[in-house]
C-alpha cells in the first residue's frame, strides 16, 4: 500500500525565512479536513491580508506571503502576526519583515 502519511495533529510552523524580504513561506499541518483561515495581522491587531479561507483536505500545506496587504500594496517593515484557524485549532506566530 502506498498511502501518504498524514499529520497526527494540527500545527503552524515558523515562517521561513524569518526575518524575510520580500517573501516568506508559512507551513501548516491538517490531520483532518477542516475549514481553514490563515490571516496576517499587524501588532495593533488589524488584519493586513487573508491568505487562506477555504475547506482543505488533511495533509501538509504551505502558502507564501509577499509582504503585501489585501489591496496588493507593499506593507511597512516590522513585526507581523500570522494566525491559523482550522476547526477548533487556533495558533498565532510572529514574523519580521526587513526592508
Would you name each region that the model predicts?
Residues 54, 95-99:
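Short beta-strand edge segments in extracellular beta-sheet folds
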Residues 46-52:
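Surface-exposed loop/edge segments in extracytoplasmic proteins
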Residues 52-87:
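Short, surface-exposed loop/turn motifs with a glycine/proline- and acidic-biased composition
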Residues 43-46, 96:
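Helix-terminus/capping and membrane-interface signal
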Residues 1-16, 20-41, 50, 62-65, ...:
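Glycine-centered coil/turn sites that cap beta-strands in beta-rich domains
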Residues 42-43, 69:
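Short, acidic, Ser/Thr-enriched surface-loop or helix-capping motifs
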Residues 89-93:
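Extracellular and select intracellular beta-sandwich modules with Ser/Thr-enriched
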Amino acid at each position: 500500500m502506498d498511502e501518504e502519511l498524514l499529520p497526527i495533529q494540527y500545527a503552524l510552523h515558523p515562517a521561513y525565512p524569518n526575518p524575510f524580504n520580500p517573501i516568506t513561506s508559512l507551513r501548516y499541518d491538517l490531520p483532518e479536513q477542516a475549514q481553514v483561515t490563515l490571516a496576517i495581522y499587524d501588532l495593533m491587531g488589524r488584519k493586513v491580508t487573508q491568505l487562506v479561507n477555504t475547506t482543505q483536505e488533511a495533509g501538509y500545506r504551505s502558502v507564501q506571503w509577499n509582504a503585501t496587504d489585501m489591496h496588493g500594496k507593499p506593507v511597512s517593515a516590522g513585526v507581523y502576526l500570522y494566525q491559523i484557524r482550522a476547526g477548533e485549532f487556533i495558533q498565532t506566530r510572529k514574523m519580521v519583515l526587513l526592508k
